[in-house]
Curated annotation (Swiss-Prot):
It is found in: Secreted. Belongs to the semaphorin family. This is Semaphorin-2A. GO terms for molecular function: chemorepellent activity; semaphorin receptor binding. Residues 673-685 have a biased composition (Polar residues). It comes from Schistocerca gregaria (Desert locust). Residues 526-634 form the Ig-like C2-type domain. Keywords: Developmental protein, Differentiation, Disulfide bond, Glycoprotein, Immunoglobulin domain, Neurogenesis, Secreted, Signal. One of its GO terms (biological process) is axon guidance. Expressed in a gradient in the developing limb bud epithelium during Ti pioneer axon outgrowth. Its main location: secreted. Residues 1-20 form the signal peptide.
Length: 697
């Protein structure tokens, strides 16, 4: 009976739990916070060793080496909102909506000046300041600065994007490109370029350009996530209601839009609007006969000095949650913009590709020296046909990585080149922030056949439980910078020694290598063990924990490789194998009366006998995690030979248990008597009492 009860308890304890996220070592983290300030905008300037953070009524300048050394007052610029009363009178909250949330920080020229735009109590306003966060001198007036409408949002909760472009604009004059809401009511969303001024004379040379107002074919309730200056174009990434799907129901698609930097609009048609605006769908999906789409882009990153764009996408937040990382090339994007256009003949018609014979010349959307010279046929076509028929395919035809029950919010990417046994390996490392304040670290490489492969290397907390609102990476300072509404954290990219205690995990991190001499994880240098691609099954075998145990007959024992299984390994198949002289090698099949799997993928052996002797190996795929050599000592506790022996042992156990119960009751009775005497004693006045009752008549 007791044995059955013990087995049931073990079974209950073996219920599978989700793998744990191991906390980062404190030496890997620096942090900065001045309270609940909504830190949502980053601009990183390695030249000035600074991370600029846009927050509530403030811009902070943090030390890139160690953000903890920064001071809330000394290293900040205060930009108080104006006309708060008017904002409150419109039904907005004084403590959040009617503050000045800084949403744009962009370098101007060589970076010695910064362009800043904030919500300013639902009345957007912009500034130009020095990079040391001091205001310009009075004589350094910058024309066109002061009103931030269409440059950053009214509502601090609205998504927006902006990029300052120095070169390639009309007259080669600098200006801001933005994607945001341009009205208090949010009815007018816009992709916008500011008026272009000659900064020497202060004269306006070119008027602003924008998307067509209130036209769902151009923009339909977009959420902007990024914008980039790329050659003769500016690219915008966003998600919006899919106008081409509206007849079948409401759905959201991810988009990339393109405008030419030299665009000055049309002469009579589209005179204030873009004459080169095009947009296309971004395809991030799991391939198959019926592809599974991650339709909603949440964040985008362009790796410096490359033509690659990396995005995090999610399923609809109203359904089952899932997220994916997909990559796109500029070449694939441009090919779609050079392809067929899409149109809807009538409001009830299906959206179909436009026949090539109906596309005017010069081709709509192509960059020309002067868009005012474009014929009306081209301008009318672009006005009614901004959408391309094809979708931009993701690299490799599949996501880099995808995961259910996770919402990715931000993404940054690093590239590593490693000399591995005379062979140069290139790894792309993705850091994806989540809505619960974690970062997923994924590594990608190309196999010998040129096919992309990826592996989840680590998961760690950065801002739990709050979402990661901003994320940036510095190769020079070897740090990852993440922000939530409450805190900014800096995490070292190379976290080997403080992160991995075993060879298996260490060897899978492209920044790290296992030192067999010191039996520790170090920053990778040639000669250390590394196996990111998981092709060397026996690489870590010499470092595997191997133990010898001598157990007595009838004893139950626990074999395990981890105190806590890292979450990155929790979803992988971990198996146990038993080696004996008689049976050879055979896999352990779990059953409640003999072999029980623990929540950390350990193994419990119930009531061992001679046949349980031998070696027990724990495997993760083709990698050995740990090994135990078990010897059953039958001399110290021999097996009962007959049923009478079992009955005698059981009877002895029952008598012992009964004696223990009697002893416990005796102790409880005496304890109660002592308590009663103590209470009676405390009620009497002691002659040495310092305080006593002495009522005054």
């Amino acid at each position: 009976m007791a044995a059955k009860l013990w087995n049931l308890l073990l079974v209950a304890a073996s219920v599978h739990l989700v793998g744990s996220v191991e906390q980062l070592h404190q030496d890997l983290i620096h942090e900065f916070s001045c309270g609940h300030k909504y830190y949502r905008t980053f601009h990183l300037d390695e030249k000035r060793e600074s991370l600029y953070v846009g927050a509530l009524d403030k811009v902070y300048k943090l030390n890139l080496t160690n953000i903890s050394l920064s001071d809330c007052e000394r290293d900040s610029l205060t930009l108080e909102p104006t006309n708060i009363a008017n904002c409150v009178s419109k039904g907005k909250s004084a403590d959040f909506d009617c503050k000045n949330h800084i949403r744009v920080i962009q370098p101007m020229g060589d970076g010695s000046r910064l362009y800043i735009c904030g919500t300013n109590a639902h009345s957007p306003k912009d500034w130009v300041v020095y990079s040391n966060l001091t205001h310009l001198q009075r004589h350094e007036y910058v024309p066109g600065i002061g009103v931030g409408i269409a440059k950053c949002p009214f509502d601090p909760e609205d998504s927006s994007t902006a990029v300052w472009v120095e070169n390639g604009n009309p007259g080669d004059l600098p200006g801001l490109y933005s994607g945001t809401n341009a009205e208090f009511t949010k009815a007018d969303t816009v992709i916008f370029r500011t008026d272009l001024y000659n900064l020497t004379t202060g004269r306006r040379e070119y008027s602003f350009k924008r998307t067509l107002k209130y036209d769902s074919k151009w923009l339909d309730n977009p959420n902007f996530v990024g914008s980039f200056d790329v050659g003769e174009y500016v690219l915008f990434f966003f998600r919006e209601t899919a106008v081409e799907y509206i007849n079948c129901g409401k759905s959201v698609y991810s988009r990339v839009a393109r405008v030419c930097k030299k665009d000055v609009g049309g002469k009579n048609i589209l005179s204030q609007n873009w004459a080169t605006f095009l947009k296309a769908r971004l395809n991030c999906s799991i391939p198959g006969e019926f592809p599974f789409y991650f339709n909603e882009i949440q964040g985008v990153y362009k790796m410096p000095n490359t033509d690659k764009f990396f995005g995090v996408f999610s399923t609809s937040v109203t359904g089952l949650t899932g997220s994916a990382i997909c990559s796109f090339t500029l070449k694939d994007i441009q090919e779609v913009f050079s392809g067929k256009f899409k149109e809807q003949a009538t409001s009830s018609s299906a959206w179909l590709p436009v026949l090539p014979s109906r596309v005017p010349d010069p081709r709509p959307g192509e960059c020309v020296n002067d868009t005012e010279l474009l014929p009306d046929t081209v301008l009318n076509f672009i006005r009614s046909h901004p959408l391309m028929d094809g979708a931009v395919s993701h690299e490799g035809g599949k996501p880099v990585f995808y995961k259910r029950d996770v919402l990715f919010t931000q993404l940054v990417v690093d590239k590593l080149k490693v000399n591995l046994v005379g062979k140069n390996m290139e790894y792309i490392v993705y850091y994806a922030g989540t809505s619960t304040g974690q970062v997923y670290k994924v590594v990608q490489w190309y196999d010998s056949g040129g096919l992309p492969q990826s592996l989840l290397v680590d998961i760690f907390d950065v801002t739990p439980p709050e979402p990661v609102q901003a994320l940036h990476l510095s190769k020079e300072y070897k740090s990852l910078y993440a922000a939530s509404d409450n805190i900014v954290r800096q995490i070292e990219l190379v976290m080997c020694h403080h992160r991995y205690s075993n060879c298996l995990q260490c060897a899978r991190d492209p920044y790290c290598g296992w030192d067999r001499d010191s039996n520790s994880c170090k920053s990778y240098t040639p000669g250390l063990l590394q196996d990111v691609t998981n092709t060397s099954a026996n690489l870590c075998e010499h470092s595997v924990m191997k133990k010898k145990l001598i157990v007595t007959w009838g004893q139950s024992i626990h074999l395990g490789c981890f105190l806590k299984v890292p979450e990155v390994l929790s979803s992988q198949t971990i198996s146990w194998v038993h080696y004996t002289k008689d049976k050879g090698r055979y896999p352990i099949v779990y059953r409640p009366d003999k072999y029980i799997e623990t929540s950390e993928h350990g193994l419990v052996l119930i009531s061992v006998t001679d046949s349980d002797s031998g070696r027990y190996d724990c495997w993760l795929g083709g990698s050995l995690l740990c090994s135990y050599n078990i010897t059953v000592d039958a001399h110290r506790c021999s097996a009962p030979g007959r049923s009478n022996d079992y009955q005698k042992i059981y009877s002895d156990w029952c008598h012992e248990f009964e004696r223990s119960k009697i002893a416990m009751k005796t102790w409880e009775r005496k304890q109660a008597q002592c308590s009663t005497k103590q209470n009676n004693s405390n009620q009497k006045t002691h002659p040495n009492d310092i305080f006593h009752s002495n009522p005054v008549a």
